[in-house]
Amino acid sequence: GIWNEGKVGDERTKKQCEYILSLVEDNKVPTIVVGDFNLHPESESIQLLNKKLTNLIEKYNIKTTRPTVKDGLDVGDSVDDYIFVNDKIKVNSFEVKQNKVSDHYPLILDFEIID
C-alpha cells in the first residue's frame, strides 16, 4: 500500500505511484484509479499521478475526504482519498458525500466510457 506516516510521501510512495503509472499510462483502455493514498495533494507522489491522469479531487476543488472531527477533536480538513481517470472516461458528475458512516467520506463518481 501507499501508507505513509507523514502524508507528505517519501521515496517509497513515489516509486509506488510510478508503478501505478507504468500500469496505466500507455494503456489505451478506460482507466480509473481509486484509493486511500494517505498523501496530501501537494506531495510529490500525487503530483506524479497528476502529470498523466486527471485528479478529480483537484478538478472539482474538493477540500476534504474525511470528517474534520475525530474523537471529539477538530482535526481540520484532510484529503487522503483520490480518484484519477484517463481521457477514455467522461465524468458526468463527481462528489464527496459528507456522510459520517466511516472515517472517510464516500467518493461518488458517475461516468461513461468514451469509445
Predicted segments, located by residue:
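Active-site regions of metal-assisted phosphoester/phosphodiester hydrolases
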Residues: 1-115
